[in-house]
Amino acid sequence: MELDINRTLLVLLGQVYTYIFQVELLRRCDPRVACRFLYRLAANCLTVRYLLKLFLRGFNTQLKFGNTPTVCALHWALCYVKGEGERLFELLQHFKTRFVYGETKDSNCIKDYFVSAFNLKTCQYHHELSLTTYGGYVSSEIQFLHDIENFLKQLNYCYIITSSREALNTLETVTRFMTDTIGSGLIPPVELFDPAHPCAICFEELCITANQGETLHRRLLGCICDHVTKQVRVNVDVDDIIRCLPYIPDVPDIKRQSAVEALRTLQTKTVVNPMGAKNDTFDQTYEIASTMLDSYNVFKPAPRCMYAISELKFWLTSNSTEGPQRTLDVFVDNLDVLNEHEKHAELTAVTVELALFGKTPIHFDRAFSEELGSLDAIDSILVGNRSSSPDSQIEALIKACYAHHLSSPLMRHISNPSHDNEAALRQLLERVGCEDDLTKEASDSATASECDLNDDSSITFAVHGWENLLSKAKIDAAERKRVYLEHLSKRSLTSLGRCIREQRQELEKTLRVNVYGEALLQTFVSMQNGFGARNVFLAKVSQAGCIIDNRIQEAAFDAHRFIRNTLVRHTVDAAMLPALTHKFFELVNGPLFNHDEHRFAQPPNTALFFTVENVGLFPHLKEELAKFMGGVVGSNWLLSPFRGFYCFSGVEGVTFAQRLAWKYIRELVFATTLFTSVFHCGEVRLCRVDRLGKDPRGCTSQPKGIGSSHGPLDGIYLTYEETCPLVAIIQSGETGIDQNTVVIYDSDVFSLLYTLMQRLAPDSTDPAFS
């Protein structure tokens, strides 16, 4: 049943996203054309209203607790498209009144419509978040999706010092931001995400991968996040128009056929070279050399210069075919070719529009063509175009980097070994221009080419002695200089390649089309469910058959003194400290990182590690937290006065509130442990309020005492609420809280333990706790 519901919700979510995409297309169309679809838009707006009314009660119920990413995404998408669809409908009606019905024919009216449709004068992504914790008021400004993710991680760290009412009010503001972003469809605006900020998933991935001697935080500096938003490869086919044109509906066949013929005529006249410009000079030289060589055969004697030309052609041919393709040869496109593609695509679109409609509509990109044309190269690349995929732009950028680096003569020689052979062939052909001096010129050219091709040939010096020594020294110095420059150039090429490989990941993330990932949605749902679980828990326990409220019991003070004075004379066994430390880590952690609840559960300290590391907690605070349970001497773990457990009155500052909360939770852990060992009433289970009915380690058997003999939900629950921090459940049924269940409210640890002792003792007859 649950699987069918999820499938239905996913299908509905897909349909809503399709409608959002259609609204976005309609908003970018010429408003004179979009006004024709007002009736269809109105029908869709009414359908969205019906869906919201149909699901509103279910949304409100599930948003309190047990929310899922699918339900959350569907709710946000419906709320967004309801507002945007109706706003677009009103704008089109207003435009139709002004422009179509003759009030004004100003062309600026179309641009004003686009400014209003896209809210170009205001930024809707800047929000101020405020949160009131037990340690005071904090605020944060959000601009990017990663700001929301960081705030949710900070809220997770402050889970134990924040009331559910304040947290849920803050999450309402976050919900409005998420509705305008994730609810707006699949593709986020470029200005909304910053991939240089790693998320929690990036941090976890780096923790389990090889570090190669680098620290984790140093690796985070070069991390490109692909979880909050995910990049996708987009293939742009320039032949989409001609392939889909014959199947366009609502167009007369004559106009459709004339558009197809006009488009084919345009394609035959316009040829765009996708491979870029080649070296035309060398192609002509190579063609002349081939023509001269083809004029000779085995029956016709050839001069020596022809053999030199043949050898140069041999080396050039062998050099161009052997070996793998170089990196430079892969990046053949350039920015000029991409611009030509864009112009050709625009010309194609205009041709089809004139053939079909007799005029060209003013869409969004044409209305702001002047603004788009004034952009510099970097902004133009970020904006992109319709005819080229982002990967083509990336390849063009990388090719431009290589071309700029290889523009020096030395780098051209290193990257292109056949450059010298090309120059020699060109010079040789120039020297063979005169037929009368062919033999002499061919001999000189062959001699020069043989010297160039055979670098290892021995050089005979006519002068011996000191002149020979000086000449050899000069040659050796020149050779060392050449080798050094070649080595230096190869190192620079290697460094350039490594730099481009490192920067390519960031280029791809920035320029490619991105879609919203599931990381931010899952984080929000986890935090909302974590705080909503408190309200749901208090609502469930209020339905118990027997409720004892020690917060108003007159005899609770005597019970407090009895249990406190009894436990203070005992100490915790040192062998139990590791287990108690893990319990402490489990209770001070937030709901976001729950590695101790996984199928292959990890210790609670692992989950707490991710909590504190993702908020950048100071090292001295992490050390203090790690040694918090081991720093107990005697009875210094006792902290709270009577009915003063989890009281933060007069505390200022988040850090001070956190320390006080740690002390309260440590007191609770030690008190329940000593109570179990002293009074032998069975093990008292300490549970988190957001894990009601969950066994974090997946055990089927419950411990003896609370949790086994009386019911699966029995235990002491820490609610993290100042008004009612402690709730104990006794005798819960198999189905949960029923009329036989006993629930105890308290704000004091020791009076609560006394009540449990009275209830769990087999001969309990004290009427004060009946």
Curated annotation (Swiss-Prot):
This protein's UniProt keywords: ATP-binding, Host nucleus, Late protein, Metal-binding, Nucleotide-binding, Viral genome packaging, Viral release from host cell, Zinc, Zinc-finger
A GO CC annotation recorded here is: host cell nucleus
Picking any one GO biological process from the record gives: viral DNA genome packaging
Residues that hold ATP according to the record: 675-682
Localization terms from the record: Host nucleus
The record's annotation in InterPro entries points to: UL28/UL56 (IPR000501)
One Pfam family of this chain: PRTP
Q: Where are the zinc fingers (C3H1-type)?
A: 199-227
What would be an example GO MF term here? zinc ion binding
Give the chief site where it resides.
host cell
Q: State its role.
A: Component of the molecular motor that translocates viral genomic DNA in empty capsid during DNA packaging. Forms a tripartite terminase complex together with TRM2 and TRM3 in the host cytoplasm. Once the complex reaches the host nucleus, it interacts with the capsid portal vertex. This portal forms a ring in which genomic DNA is translocated into the capsid. TRM1 carries an endonuclease activity that plays an important role for the cleavage of concatemeric viral DNA into unit length genomes.
Annotated family: Belongs to the herpesviridae TRM1 protein family.
Q: How does it assemble?
A: Associates with TRM2 and TRM3 to form the tripartite terminase complex. Interacts with portal protein.
Q: State the protein's name.
A: Tripartite terminase subunit 1
User: Which gene name does the record give?
Assistant: TRM1
